[in-house]
Amino acid sequence: MIISEANRKEICKYLFKEGVCFAKKDFNLAKHPLIDVPNLQVIKLMQSFKSKEYVRETFAWMHYYWFLTNEGIEFLRTYLNLPSDVVPATLKKSAKPGGRPFGGPPGDRSRGPRHEGGDRPRFGDRDGYRAGPRAGGEFGGEKGGAPADYQPSFQGSGRGFGRGAGGYSAAAPSGSGLP
């Protein structure tokens, strides 16, 4: 497919900047949602890059996803005349959130109010959510179940779902009362 040089550069700039690209599998879509070029041109250029192993393709839920490979990074770097210190966003280290530190000496910070025994209770306030004693005795009480004279028995290979014997044309088992 013939793709104009301006559209080709736009797609390549976006792919190099982000390191990934996606497109909905809709060949009639007028414009790609993030790049100002027709969706079909994005798909066809990425198919070309895939055959040259510049990108790796994944398809899920009617969307194509392309991930830039090392060879693709080198190709786009020369194609777009970029210096070697410019890298795609997928290769940049993300800044760690400035939350609380995980480690450190045990006496660094307060652990909340102390309880009798010198330490926090193991499970906190969970007792407030637990149910109290039940009618049949302590926790648990009498269990309701089958009556004492109940005798479960296996009924054999009757007609039913699952791994039954035979199919539609199989004869009914004897004593089942079925024709």
UniProtKB/Swiss-Prot annotation:
Statement: the UniProt record of this protein carries the keyword Disulfide bond: no
Biased composition (Basic and acidic residues): 108-129
Gene3D superfamilies listed in its UniProt record: Winged helix-like DNA-binding domain superfamily/Winged helix DNA-binding domain
InterPro entries documented for this protein: Plectin_eS10_N, Ribosomal_eS10, WH-like_DNA-bd_sf
Subcellular location as annotated: Cytoplasm
Gene Ontology terms: cellular component: cytosolic ribosome; cytosolic small ribosomal subunit; plant-type cell wall; plastid
Keywords, alphabetical: Cytoplasm, Ribonucleoprotein, Ribosomal protein
Disordered as annotated region, ranges: 90-179
Entry's Gene Ontology molecular function annotations: mRNA binding; structural constituent of ribosome
UniProt-listed Pfam families: S10_plectin
Compositional bias segments (type: Gly residues): 134-144, 157-167
Family recorded in the similarity comment: Belongs to the eukaryotic ribosomal protein eS10 family.
Name of protein: Small ribosomal subunit protein eS10x
Name of the gene: RPS10C
